[in-house]
Amino acid sequence: MGLPRGPLASLLLLQVCWLQCAASEPCRAVFREAEVTLEAGGAEQEPGQALGKVFMGCPGQEPALFSTDNDDFTVRNGETVQERRSLKERNPLKIFPSKRILRRHKRDWVVAPISVPENGKGPFPQRLNQLKSNKDRDTKIFYSITGPGADSPPEGVFAVEKETGWLLLNKPLDREEIAKYELFGHAVSENGASVEDPMNISIIVTDQNDHKPKFTQDTFRGSVLEGVLPGTSVMQVTATDEDDAIYTYNGVVAYSIHSQEPKDPHDLMFTIHRSTGTISVISSGLDREKVPEYTLTIQATDMDGDGSTTTAVAVVEILDANDNAPMFDPQKYEAHVPENAVGHEVQRLTVTDLDAPNSPAWRATYLIMGGDDGDHFTITTHPESNQGILTTRKGLDFEAKNQHTLYVEVTNEAPFVLKLPTSTATIVVHVEDVNEAPVFVPPSKVVEVQEGIPTGEPVCVYTAEDPDKENQKISYRILRDPAGWLAMDPDSGQVTAVGTLDREDEQFVRNNIYEVMVLAMDNGSPPTTGTGTLLLTLIDVNDHGPVPEPRQITICNQSPVRQVLNITDKDLSPHTSPFQAQLTDDSDIYWTAEVNEEGDTVVLSLKKFLKQDTYDVHLSLSDHGNKEQLTVIRATVCDCHGHVETCPGPWKGGFILPVLGAVLALLFLLLVLLLLVRKKRKIKEPLLLPEDDTRDNVFYYGEEGGGEEDQDYDITQLHRGLEARPEVVLRNDVAPTIIPTPMYRPRPANPDEIGNFIIENLKAANTDPTAPPYDTLLVFDYEGSGSDAASLSSLTSSASDQDQDYDYLNEWGSRFKKLADMYGGGEDD
């Protein structure tokens, strides 16, 4: 066969349908092979050249219809492939020599793609094609199929007759569910061995027009400006059809407008593109003011307009264009405005506009065309009512002009879409006279005056004028004078000095200027006031001497470093530098002072040794005008060399030691006094009263043999003063018992009266109801000779209470009076 020299074209030829085919005839019309290689000689081929035969038909049968997926080729007479256009070799052909001879093998185990229409009516199962292997001459062959639609979902759609190989369709197909099935055919021998490779079986479901078109929306909405030209696009509608629109017309949708409402100005205002569904304006005359909205009934028809139809609604909104000019209503106005009123509303202008409210074509824009030479007025648009609001930008002057005639034009925010006449209004403004405030001339007056002028010296005259035509009297006074330096004559406006003007006063003077505000008042009805500003530029005089800074220095007394002090002078040139320095009050004995060449610093040096201490250096500085200022510099001299790093404090032992000794002596005296007090408290004198005094007899009843563990009783628990009294619970429901306080006699000056003083005060103490019983120091653990204490056995004495003498209770004071009365009168009972 040789090596090919031209391009090779591999074509997949699809059988579309068979017109007539008799399965029972021995001749079968089939493709030569599943893949056929055709040779085109030469680098360039002319159209119409036959390349080769690919299909073997049967005599007497009508030819089959074929199609190819390559537009460069066509099938002639149902069998021969030929070129449709001129072909050129696209890429250089690479030839690889080979000694192997290429041979073409005939294959019978091939089935062409099978086309089956959807929605078939049967009867089922329906034979589609027969699988045939050429190995059936040698052995018995059994056929089977696998794949989706056979043994996998959807199962059972197709089947095969096991022995004959007929491919069967078991139920109707739906192309919209599955458009193509890919199955595999198998051939096995009786013993189950495969005799053929699995064969691909393609089943194409051909479409039928079983679906109507569907619009994507029930209602479509679009908009277009009024007055647009024909051909302007409005919107696009879309309908879909599930049927095939590639190989058939079943899914090809054609659009049309069924009706239009309203039919104004006529019934064909819009058109729709048949294929794309684009709605456009076809006629002029869209006017929103007449028809703001159109409703179109649109329809979609499949089969390219010859099939099933569905409808939807398209609403077209006509947008407003500025085709109507605003008009003043009315066109003439008169208004009255008081003079000097700023921001005063003069008049509201009303307009009408047929365009859509609150749109740019409706919102008005006002412009003052004439009559406002002084730019006294302004006009704005009210955002809701669309009215024009005329207000005063400046105050009007009745004396200058008492009437203004204004001309105002109105347009819209959006430009007109066509040439339209504009509307103009006339406003006559009458100015009303009012009492105007006096006006200082000038409003801000600058006056130069020398600082420090004498009190009562005139500064200037500052007066105001009355804008009114009437001759009104004006009075003056100072409204604000921060330092209180000035006074103003109420009739003439004469300003005089009442204080010392000081240019260097930083609290009230800024940049040599002292600001004062003055007031003028007329006698009109009602009276009005005006203010003016008086700016006094204070001229400097040499009233301040130079001073050094800083005024405290620290310097070493050995190899000292010179101290540089800055010189400041509050005055201005020429009352400042050059400065001169001089030491006074014998400061020049140990110090020197020199002014540097620039004249802005003074150098202070220590020329003799000084011991560490603080000294006063008297430095006198004078300026160019010989204004002298004496300043005392506090100089701290340290025991050090050169620069001062640390300055140790001087030893002050001569002062500290006496102070320390005095403190120690005071502490020693306090310690001795404390010891004496403590020793005095420890001395206890036993109180031995007469033995016949029954009050001192303490009977010890605790002796019960063996002795008591506690031999000493804490007598401090019995000797309680007034400070140890229990707390009194306050009550507000019981009247308190008032106990009289005893009256003690003061100590007499005469020593002879001491005895009476002791007796009287002892009696007062004994009768004191607030004192505790036995207000004496009792020693209960004293049981020496003479003690009347006995054993507890004395309690069993046969003596009765009647043998006891209780008269001594009367001697115990008022607190035991009740007890003495109870026991003292027992025999009488």
UniProtKB/Swiss-Prot annotation:
State a single Gene Ontology molecular function: cadherin binding
Q: Topology: which residues are Extracellular? A: 108-654
Instruction: Give me the residues of the propeptide, which is removed upon maturation.
Output: 25-107
Q: Which residues form the signal peptide?
A: 1-24
InterPro entries recorded for this chain? Answer: Cadherin, Cadherin-like_dom, Cadherin-like_sf, Cadherin_CS, Cadherin_pro_dom, Cadherin_Y-type_LIR, Catenin-bd_sf
**Per the record's keyword annotation, is Repeat included, yes or no?**
yes
Q: In which tissues is it expressed?
A: Expressed in some normal epithelial tissues and in some carcinoma cell lines.
Its Gene Ontology cellular component terms are: adherens junction; catenin complex; cell junction; cytoplasm; plasma membrane
Q: Which GO terms describe its biological process?
A: adherens junction organization; calcium-dependent cell-cell adhesion via plasma membrane cell adhesion molecules; cell adhesion; cell migration; cell morphogenesis; cell-cell adhesion mediated by cadherin; cell-cell junction assembly; hair cycle process
| Function in brief | Cadherins are calcium-dependent cell adhesion proteins. They preferentially interact with themselves in a homophilic manner in connecting cells; cadherins may thus contribute to the sorting of heterogeneous cell types.
What does the annotation say about its assembly with partners? Interacts with CDCP1 and CTNNB1.
- Name by which UniProt lists this protein: Cadherin-3
Q: Which organism is it from?
A: Homo sapiens (Human)
